[in-house]
């Protein structure tokens, strides 16, 4: 049997766009969720007036909140319990470092103030909390759009420096170093990578001196950080803005990319002229995540098309289109965040199937313009990128397009999880725990996925 079962829906109050499970042993029950809320002047109470009686115009404000949840498998009704909330500038991206640093788990945030923040996980009375550790402003008047750690592959060399690559709304990439003794952020290099927003930056986990970037100019680029500013390749294979990239932590030469063009491409990094496979997913691909244990499974947050789980086995080995194993759309919402849990998930018992209401148990927010996240408009700009590439303006189809009505699901009522060092052979191939977050209904969803 194969299917996705809803365990819980949490109202995040502000619109949610980023969700990340902690990968570190002993902390894998912890889930971070970031939010992004655009507050326009008209949303505020009546403001002050100047002496002439005219209203003082205030700029738009991007608000954010960081939530930390603990997964408790002894509570079958509400397994996710909030343990901390922290108001911040709006959050565009988050990533946990894959290794402990100075004895602590570290969470990196990319925020709307143009900064990369480091937060340290510390034990509290009953659980854990995140406390500020370091912050670095990338540039003036920009939004920090993404970040990635250099530690994605198991078995990091002891002499390998700890690095972060980040991207911003001006099209720049920023290479940062993290001092592991007294964790602090230090900028190593910055360079112009794209003409417009650099939506995503990511390491090659097997060769962390190599990074990749995707921009709103529709370009996918590779860079050698030892020679900042000189690209290794430029691919125009995506036809709209490139907004998601992840190197496989399991297979050395495999890279996945996603775009507003609603396609996921798999690449062999030894030949970036042509992808191994091209899979349409009917929605802009904001985030993609390889499964922590099963090398062929890829999770994708596909905006108005919900989330999808792909089997990439044949795509990698036979250059065939990846198989979409699971596809779930959520009415009146945009799925921007998705992540696999590192917990081993076993011994599930389920109640009879039932149908969710259309809002999946949360209050549905009024629909707002797609510009709440820094998403471009729907039309194409025929600007030229200087390389003979007519620049398509990234956009999304109407939110209602392709959305399904209420679906029938099974509710999981009990589970057993294990947080420990994992031998891939021990991981139960049938069950996985995952989380997604959606924008307009400000909701965090917890799912159990059962595969073959």
Curated annotation (Swiss-Prot):
SMART domains, per the entry: WD40
Phosphoserine modified-residue sites: 353
GO cellular component: cytoplasm
Top-rank lineage group of the source organism: Eukaryota
Biased composition range(s): Basic and acidic residues: 378-390
Region (Disordered): 371-402
Catalytic activity: diphthine methyl ester-[translation elongation factor 2] + H2O = diphthine-[translation elongation factor 2] + methanol + H(+)
Keywords from the UniProt entry: Hydrolase, Phosphoprotein, Repeat, WD repeat
UniProt-listed Pfam families: WD40
Keyword flag Membrane: no
Chain's role: Catalyzes the demethylation of diphthine methyl ester to form diphthine, an intermediate diphthamide biosynthesis, a post-translational modification of histidine which occurs in translation elongation factor 2 (EEF2) which can be ADP-ribosylated by diphtheria toxin and by Pseudomonas exotoxin A (Eta).
Subunit relationships: Interacts with INCA1.
Protein name: Diphthine methyltransferase
Name of the gene this protein is made from: DPH7
């Amino acid at each position: 049997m194969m299917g996705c079962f809803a365990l819980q829906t949490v109202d995040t109050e502000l619109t949610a766009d980023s969700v990340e499970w902690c990968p570190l042993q002993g902390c894998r029950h912890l889930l971070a969720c970031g939010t992004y809320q655009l507050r326009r002047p008209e949303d505020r109470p009546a403001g002050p007036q100047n002496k002439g009686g005219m209203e003082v115009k205030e700029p738009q404000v991007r608000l954010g909140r960081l939530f930390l949840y603990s997964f408790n498998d002894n509570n079958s009704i509400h397994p996710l319990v909030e343990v901390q909330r922290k108001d911040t500038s709006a959050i565009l991206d988050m990533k946990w470092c894959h290794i402990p640093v100075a004895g602590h788990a570290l969470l990196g945030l990319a925020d709307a103030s143009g900064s990369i923040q480091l937060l340290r996980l510390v034990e509290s009375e009953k659980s854990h909390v995140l406390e500020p550790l370091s912050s670095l402003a990338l540039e003036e008047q920009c939004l920090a759009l993404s970040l990635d750690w250099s530690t994605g592959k198991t078995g990091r060399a002891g002499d390998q420096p700890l690095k972060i690559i980040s991207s911003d709304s001006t099209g720049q990439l920023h290479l940062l170093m993290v001092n592991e003794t007294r964790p602090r952020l230090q900028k190593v290099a910055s360079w112009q990578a794209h003409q417009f927003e650099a939506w995503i930056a990511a390491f090659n986990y097997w060769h962390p001196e190599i990074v990749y970037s995707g921009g709103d100019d529709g370009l996918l680029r590779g860079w050698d950080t030892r020679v900042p500013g000189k690209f290794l390749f430029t691919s125009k294979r995506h036809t709209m803005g490139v907004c998601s990239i992840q190197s496989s932590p399991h297979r050395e030469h495999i890279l996945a990319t996603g775009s507003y063009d609603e396609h996921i491409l798999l690449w062999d990094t030894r030949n970036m002229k042509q992808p191994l496979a091209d899979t349409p997913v009917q929605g802009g691909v904001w985030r993609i995540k390889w499964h922590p244990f099963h090398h062929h499974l890829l999770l994708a947050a596909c905006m108005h098309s919900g989330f999808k789980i792909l089997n990439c086995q044949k795509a990698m080995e036979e250059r065939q289109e990846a198989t979409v194993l699971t596809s779930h759309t959520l009415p009146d919402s945009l799925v921007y965040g998705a992540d696999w849990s590192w917990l081993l998930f076993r011994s599930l018992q389920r109640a009879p199937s039932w149908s969710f209401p259309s809002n999946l148990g949360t209050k549905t927010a009024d629909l707002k313009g797609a510009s709440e996240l820094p998403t471009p408009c729907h039309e194409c700009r025929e600007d030229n990128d200087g390389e003979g590439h007519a620049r398509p303006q990234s956009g999304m189809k109407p939110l209602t397009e392709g959305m399904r009505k209420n679906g029938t699901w099974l509710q999981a009522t009990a589970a057993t999880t294990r947080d420990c060092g994992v031998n891939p052979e021990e991981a139960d191939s049938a069950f996985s725990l995952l989380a997604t977050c959606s924008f307009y209904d400000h909701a965090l969803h917890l799912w159990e996925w059962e595969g073959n």
